[in-house]
Amino acid sequence: MILMKSPEMNTRIFLDGGDPAETEEIKRLLGFLDGQTTNPTLIAKNPEARRRLGQGLKYTEQEVLDFYRGVVRTVSGMIPDGSVSVEVYADATTTAESMLKQGREMFSWIPNAHIKFPTSTEGLRAAEQAVKEGMRVNLTLCFSEVQAAAVYAATRGAAKGQVFVSPFVGRLDDRGENGMDVIANIIALFRQADGHVEVLTASVRNLDHLLYAIRLGSDIITAPYGILKEWAGQGMPLPSPEYRYPVGALQPVPRREISLERPWREYDIGHPLTDRGMEKFSADWKALIATEDRKIA
């Protein structure tokens, strides 16, 4: 059976992965693919990288960048009309200037890149300048409505399609909080705004995350291979009007009264999960590189 994207669905579907073989398979299963998101952890899980590490071999810093570039160029060629998110290296000490330097280089790799910066103070500084230079950006590791407001303020004046914000659902669920409430809250926050920031639902762990994000009207959803394969296997169902998201024991995350008119530096954007996510991504990146060759900071 050949599947096609329902004309009733406005949400774009991205694959969250670092293996072009998965890209090819998901395109075949769905009959379409609107884009792809990558990050250091996903690149470290690429079969070629895992084989190399399994042999006790590591990369030089330039080799790992060349490998990452090769992966995203292959993916870009498969979805030339879609977006491919490419993530800079960022740990707790990485400056905006370093992120921006990396971002400029990565943006030149492919014609359809969105550069991922963390939703941290330095990440927002980098994104603010990147947008002014005409780059497309994706603010990742977002866990709160306040952080999303800061993304909006830092990128004010950008064109629609130039800025994504990626709230992470599953990692909030892991803390016992209803991560889908954060998606709903951010979508509601932006409803009366100018539309220059698009909501990209990320850290999707199950089919209900996917279905509820579609129901909420998320601009984009990125999901791993297994979940998109499961969705395709069921015929790519859309949530019915009677659909109810199974909250279970997750605690609600109430909406807040937040103005989008303030300078971005006035928002309290600190979040422990953002810090933890940066630590995890940077550790996975460093694990690919021989100790004596680590230079990124």
Where in this protein do the model-derived segments appear?
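Active-site-proximal helix-loop elements at catalytic-domain edges
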Residues: 1-9
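Active-site beta->alpha loop and helix N-cap motifs at the rims of alpha/beta catalytic domains
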Residues: 9-13, 17-25, 29-33, 38-132
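Ligand-binding grooves and catalytic loops that recognize ribose/phosphate and carbohydrate rings
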Residues: 50-57, 61-65, 154-157, 181-189, ...
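Generic secondary-structure signature for well-ordered alpha-helical cores
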Residues: 73-80, 108, 153-157, 188-192, ...
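Catalytic alpha/beta core domains of metabolic enzymes, predominantly
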Residues: 121, 127, 136-255
